[in-house]
Amino acid sequence: LASEGARFVTAIAPAPWTLPSHITMLTGRHPAAHGVNNTDRRLADEIPTLAEVLRGQGYATAGFVAGPYLRRDYGYDRGFDLYDESLVADGRASHRGTTSPQLVANLSSWLAGEREAEQPKPFFAFLHIWDVHYDFAPPPPFDTLFDPSYEGEVDGRNIGFLKSSMSERDLEHVVALYDGEIRFSDRELGVLFEKLRAWGLWDNTIVVLTADHGEEFFEHGKIGHLMHIFDEAIQVPLIVRYPPAIDAGLVLEEQVRLMDIAPTILGLAGIESSRLGMPPEAPVREKDLSPWLRGDFLAGSIPDLVAFPENYGGGRVGVRMNQGKLIRHNEDYYELYNVRPELGERERETGKAPEVIAVLAELIQQEAEWNEWKKDGAIVAPSMTLSDPLREQLEALGYIER
C-alpha cells in the first residue's frame, strides 16, 4: 500500500489510548477540543463528524467496528447510514478470538449492495480492525510465523500481568505474537483491497491506513498502552493512497497528527474542511494535508507541535515536536528527549536546562490558551453512564476496575 501511495514517517496520535484518539480521527479535533478524555464521556451532539459531513455531501456511509471503545454509546454512529457493532455486541468479551475476517466480510457485503443500487453513491467506509489489540493471539499459521522455535509458557494473553523482570526470550515471543497479529490483519486487508480491484473501485478510492496508538514492550518500564506518552505508544503508521492525486512512493518526513486525517480526506474529495466546524479561534486546529500529498510543498507549514494537555500517561503531560519531546511529570520535574528513532527517547535533559525551559514555556502557553478557550464557551463532552455490557467489556480488557 505504501509503495502505491504516500507514507508519513512521523504520524502522532493525540493520546496513548483508543477513545480520545478515535474521536480525534473522526472529528479533526484535538482531545482538548472534543473533551472525550475519559471512559464516561461521549461526543457532544454539537460537534460535526467526518461521516456527517460526507453524508451531507451525498455519500453513502458505513462503519464496522469490533472494540468496546468504538461502541455507539460514545456517539460514533452519528452520520453513518449503517454502524455495525455486531462484533462487540452485548455478551461478547470483545477481545477474544479473531474478528478481522468477519469485519471485512461485513464491509464487503455492504459495498456489494451499494454497487447494485439503481443510482450508486460515492461511499465512505470506516473499518476498525481490532485483532492487533491485545490479547496477542493470532490464528495459525501467524501464531508461529515469527517465532516458530518458542517452547515457553507465555501465550500473549493477559499481558497486563507480565512484569519487566520477565525473561528476554519470553518478551521476544510476545513481540513475535504482536507481529503475527499485524501480519494476519495485513492479509485480511489484502482481501478487501482485492475486492475493490475486482469491482473497479481501487484506483478511484481514497484509502487511509492508520492506528489510534502503539504498544509498549518495556522500553520505558511498562507493557501495553495508556501508561506513557513515549513514541512507542503514540507514534502510529499513516499511509494514504489515491492515484488521481498522490504520486506512488511519496514519503513525508514532517510530523503530522491524527487530527489532520479528517480534513485531509475532505481536501482530497474536494470538500472544504471548514465543514468540520472547528472554531477559528481554537488554540490548536486541524490541518488539511492534501496540498502536500498533491506535491505542493510550498503550501504553508505543517504544524510542528502535538500537545498532550489532558494528563495522559500516569499524570504526565507533554508536547512533541519534530526533534524533541517535553514530558512534565509534576510541577517540579521535567524531561526533554531527543526523538530521533535510533536514540529510543533515552537521552534526556532534566531540570533547568535551557532547552527544557524553552519548550516548557511553549507547553505552559498552550495550556493557558486551552483553559482560556474552554472558559469562553468551548463545547463540553457530556457525561454518560456506562451500560452493564460495556462496563463488563472494559473490565475484561483491564481498562476499568471491577
Show the residue positions of the predicted features:
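Catalytic domains that recognize anionic headgroups
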Residues: 1-402
